[in-house]
Amino acid sequence: KRDGAICLGTIDGAIWITHLKVKNGIKLPATYVLKEKIQGVKENRLSLTFDMSYKTFYEIGSHKDGDVSYLCFNFHNGAMNSEQAIRLKYAFEYLKETAKVIVLIGARDFFSNGIHLNILEDSQKQGEDGWSNINAMNDLIKSIIFADDVITVSSLHRNAGAGGVFLALACDYVVGKENTVLNPHYKTMGLSGSEYHTYSLPKRVGQKKADELLKNCLPLSTQKAKKIGMIDEVFSHTDYFDSLRSYATSLIDDEDKYDDFIYDKEDYLEENKKYINDCKENEIKIMYPEFWEETSLFHKLRYDFVYKNSSSETPKRLKGY
């Protein structure tokens, strides 16, 4: 087993099964579903920065291209539990030791969608595990924001929602593939949100537009996101990764320009450290009862979401959109 998945031997090799669900249940990591049947099975771990050229199941991997490191995190449906967020943080911090630029790639199907709602719904300690999950996400994002010795880039080549959008906005630069869809809001899940969004979103689009995006809960394309200043560049889907590579390497082509950026970043973070941390602390203060109180709307909306209890009609906010 590895990172919630199980490996089964076959006639001609082996197959990794990452998720399962019992009848009338919800999809969960395979080891969660089979926990009583796989006692004693050893965990076959990989290094935090696994070389993705080797063919096996992995959740976190990296690729180095000169002074640019690409960090991939292939979490199912873009959802990230506490343990995954912690591992990703450690992988990011390890790559900082040898890279000048770190590019966050995300997963094959989604960039990221924030905390892991299915695992929280399955938990016997929903408040405690939800609180742990959001704080682990915040620790990851703090590590990215305060990485004052590298340039960080997020690559939105797949859709992102809620905390996953704000994970991307934690980076110095944000680029995306054309027609990728972003949902930069939390309210439809009964949450006010954290992940430093009250710092990163207004920083890019201004307070008025940030409030509008969070309140209206509408999706927007990467093209629209660039137009309002939320992201920096949009590349064509036909040559996206070539464009991404050129963009990342261009950030270190001029050594003097790179050094100036790092110096300015260090000064900015030092001057704004208290403000940035205060943003997160205020977010968490508001979120606390949303996780812990039994009457919190989050519990009902999360249940409906994971059990796919859809509305009988299109929400008003999406009609005609």
Show where each model-derived region lies.
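An anion-binding loop in the catalytic cleft
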Residues: K1-F57
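STAS-typified acidic loop motif
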Residues: L48-R87, R108
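A structural preference for short, pocket-lining loop segments at secondary-structure junctions
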Residues: G66-F73, A85-E128, D139-V153, N179-V181, ...
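Hydrophobic/aromatic residues within transmembrane alpha-helices
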Residues: L104, L167-L169, A225, M287
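Long amphipathic alpha-helix in the N-terminal Rossmann-like dinucleotide-binding domain
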Residues: N133-A136
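Crotonase-fold acyl-CoA enzyme core
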Residues: F146-D149, V153-A162, A170-V181, H185-D259
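C-terminal long alpha-helix characteristic of the crotonase
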Residues: I231-F298
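Patatin-like phospholipase
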Residues: T295-H299, S310-Y321
